[in-house]
């Protein structure tokens, strides 16, 4: 399964082997949004809406959304929530936010974009 992310007129190909779920983040100056996609052999399928931090408690909303998906195991939910915590902490650790490319380098198993329309999927 390939994921293509369009950024600044270039396309970056990434592979997420053996992952059942992938976290996607909308990386903005004043907000961070997170959603979860299920990785299938046909591409990704969104399973949650975007949850925004710090506008709302994105972590708590994501926890509730995952709890309502009985086909996501407790361990998978914990792993997704722990990764979300790490990204939120990284995003808010300094007054000057890390760049999108720094976030991508630090969390290579997540998808990041700074513009909602830039996230494209192809098989």
From Swiss-Prot:
Q: Does the keyword Plastid apply?
A: yes
Supply one GO CC term from the record.
ribosome
Name the gene behind this protein: ycf65
Task: Name one molecular function that GO assigns to this entry.
Answer: structural constituent of ribosome
Keywords, in A-Z order: Chloroplast, Plastid, Ribonucleoprotein, Ribosomal protein
Q: Which InterPro entries match?
A: PSRP-3/Ycf65_sf, Ribosomal_PSRP3/Ycf65
Q: Which domain of life is it from?
A: Eukaryota
Instruction: Name the Pfam families on file.
Output: PSRP-3_Ycf65
Q: What is its main location?
A: plastid
This protein is called: Small ribosomal subunit protein cS23
Self-association state and partner proteins as the record states: Part of the 30S ribosomal subunit.
Keyword match Cell cycle:
no
The record's subcellular location field reads: Plastid, Chloroplast
Q: Which GO terms describe its biological process?
A: translation
What does it do?
Answer: Probably a ribosomal protein or a ribosome-associated protein.
Q: Which NCBIfam families match?
A: PRK02724.1
